[in-house]
Amino acid sequence: MYEIFGKYIPNPPEFSPPQELLDEASRWTDTALWIVGRKSGGEECDRRLENDYYLSNQEKVLLEAICAHFPKVAVVLNGNGLMDLSWVEEHSQIQALLFLGVPGEEGPAALAELLVGKANPSGKLSVTIAKRRNDYPAWEDFSWDKDHPKQIKTYEDYGLIPPLVDRVFAHRPVTAYREDIYLGYRYFDSFGIEPLYPCLLYTSDAA
């Protein structure tokens, strides 16, 4: 028993709309809204790579179907953290991308106001979004695989002494933040790594 809080629950299967529904919808609108959801998870077991950080196979099929039917696509990310977004640049139909996060019970109402133009997100990007997961400096130290507890990195792997509470649960995931001052955009700028979306970005075409 190495887990005391939470248990990872995979995302439910994605709904696959029938072809006739897509055909009918594309006859009366040229715009599609796709909401990509992720569960918030539990403590120490929030994320996985397959079907979580990356799109699932079902989601990939749905994305291709949407882009094949609608020339304008808006994507809303509804989850507790970032995911791989390399597919956004690969589909020219995607013209808007909004990170909604986990906004709570009033989230849908706020989203509706943004979508119809009643409100403006009015914020600059507060994080750097990498092109590849390996571009994040903390990735190699991110210990997440609780399905294989013996592969989890512990305090001892970093030469650290665990706090008393963690000495009972030897295989609790530990991530060592060793970036020093090179956090976020400082790391990408200092080491010449081109991000997918830079931190603090407003727009590239403003006067």
Name each model feature, range by range.
Residues 1-207:
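C-terminal non-catalytic regions of proteins with extracellular/luminal or membrane-system context
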